[in-house]
A protein has these predicted regions:
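Extracytoplasmic "Venus flytrap"/periplasmic binding protein-like
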Residues: 50, 54-123, 157-160, 258-268, ...
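C-terminal capping/gating helix-and-loop segments adjacent to ligand/active sites or protein-protein/ligand interfaces
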Residues: 368-421
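Extracytoplasmic/periplasmic solute-binding protein
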Residues: 134, 138-142, 147, 171-223, ...
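N-terminal secretory signal peptides and thylakoid transit peptides that target proteins
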Residues: 1-17
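Mature extracytoplasmic/periplasmic domains
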Residues: 274-277, 309, 314-391, 428-430
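Extracytoplasmic "Venus flytrap"
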Residues: 33-50, 69-71, 145-146, 384-389
């Protein structure tokens, strides 16, 4: 993957391709109706609905019904609609779920529409292939992102601590949390850092820094000792009251609104880089962005570029061609690109990136600069996640970490449970 010059805006790197549906006969042009669902913040919902309005204005023969589903309910409703063969024509996925849901038969294969309803001419092959599973294209990457740490630099500075420009180490983060407790604001239920044991994507980065993987060959890529070391790090912070308490941390449902940073309980939050736009809208303090902690200079950072979010088309849709046209508009139209900004990540289409550059505000520019700063510091993109990866996050890792945080399990028990239950939950595709 190669970065283009800064005036050219950003990478030719790592984004996923655009998708077009393969299903069924197209409905009459006079009465084509599409359903489109996603999760995310109110800001994302407004941007998406504004693009839907633009599309309908340009295509009055098509009606697009958009719906934002709260993150806590999205996957439950998607599973229910899959069981009833009533999945929306266009639905949002992410890297850890596209492999899972395509393996369950929920996603249409999109290759047959490339170069027809779907223009991929500004995408490199490596960009398209990020949403290719077992050689078949199942989704459309909507923006480039990576993992990150967002933080209130002014509040940290007021406590006499700072986050270095380069990647902070895990040891230094623990020391920062200790110093913040001593010198930070006298504010009830306020810490420097979250209780990060429950974040599967942070665990993913931590494992990569040690030469391990979260998933490998259709199952877990780590062992009990890895899990013990991970859980022990966070338990040491929690037991010394240096991180967000269990009763508050367990409210986090991996949404911007429920993160301890947004709730005013921590000065630092773990997230994905494109989410800076949404976090800043809900935080009065100016937020900074940097890498998740690491092991120090010269060591693997554990980060990689990823398609932040993905549009897929339901395998049961009877309006596949029109759904493909909508996705094509979503990622290639200049006006749509200006509305969407970088809220879902840095746009994959070069022409959209270049048109967007002069319009970015300070927060959006931080997102782009962060993605650019990662060039030359990244790991390779992982193999497709196994079937059950979404359940591993929501139904395995979070509950086990929460049980540990509430003192209902020891580090050893939690680690063994993560290995055993994780192994049972995952299965290889095909």
């Amino acid at each position: 993957m190669q970065m283009i010059d800064r005036r050219g805006f950003l990478v030719t790197a790592a984004l996923a391709g655009l998708g077009v549906a393969a299903g069924g006969l197209r409905a009459s042009a006079a009465d084509t109706r599409l359903r489109c669902v996603w999760w995310g913040s109110a800001d994302r919902s407004k941007r998406t609905n504004d693009v839907i309005a633009l599309y309908q204005k340009a295509n009055p023969q098509t009606e697009v019904s958009g719906e934002m589903i709260a993150g806590s309910d999205y996957w439950t409703k998607l599973a229910t609609s899959m069981a009833g063969r009533n999945v929306a024509d266009i639905f949002q996925l992410e890297p850890s779920t596209i492999a899972d849901y395509s393996g369950r038969g929920a996603c249409m294969e999109l290759d047959q529409f490339v170069g027809k309803s779907l223009d991929l001419s500004t995408f490199g092959k490596s960009e398209v292939d990020l949403c290719r599973i077992d050689g078949k294209l199942y989704g459309v990457g909507l923006g480039l992102n990576s993992f990150c740490m967002m933080y209130d630099a002014d509040t940290l500075k007021g406590a006499g601590v700072t986050v270095p420009k380069e990647q902070i180490t895990w040891k230094a983060l623990a020391e920062l949390a200790r110093d913040f407790k001593k010198n930070g604001p006298a504010k009830r239920n306020y810490w420097a850092v979250p209780y990060g044991a429950r974040y599967h994507y942070v665990f993913d980065v931590w494992l990569r820094q040690r030469g391990k993987l979260l998933f490998q060959d259709g199952t877990i890529g780590f062992n009990k000792e890895d899990a013990k070391e991970w859980f022990a790090y966070w338990e040491d912070l929690r037991e010394n009251k240096l991180c967000v308490s269990a009763d508050i941390q367990t409210r986090d449902d991996n949404t911007i609104e429920s993160n301890a940073l947004t709730l005013g309980n921590s000065a630092i939050g773990f997230a994905y880089s494109n989410q800076l736009v949404g976090y800043q809208k809900l935080n009065k303090q100016t937020l900074s962005i940097g890498m998740l902690p690491g092991e120090g200079p010269g060591k693997p950072t554990g980060h990689y570029y990823r398609p932040g979010l993905i549009w897929s088309i339901s395998s049961t849709s009877t309006n596949g061609e029109e759904a493909a046209k909508f996705i094509n508009f979503f990622v290639n139209d200049l006006e749509a690109g200006k509305v969407l900004g970088v809220e879902r990540g840095v746009p994959p289409a070069k022409v959209v990136r270049e048109a967007l550059l002069p319009t970015l505000n300070e927060t959006e520019r931080k997102t782009v600069d962060y993605i650019e700063s990662l060039s030359g510091k990244l790991d390779s993109y992982p193999e497709p996640a196994p079937i059950g990866a979404n359940e591993f996050d929501r139904g395995v890792m979070r509950p086990i970490a929460d049980s540990l945080a509430f003192g209902r399990a020891s580090v050893d028990e939690a680690a063994q449970n993560l290995v055993d239950t994780g192994s049972r939950t995952l299965r290889k595709r095909g």
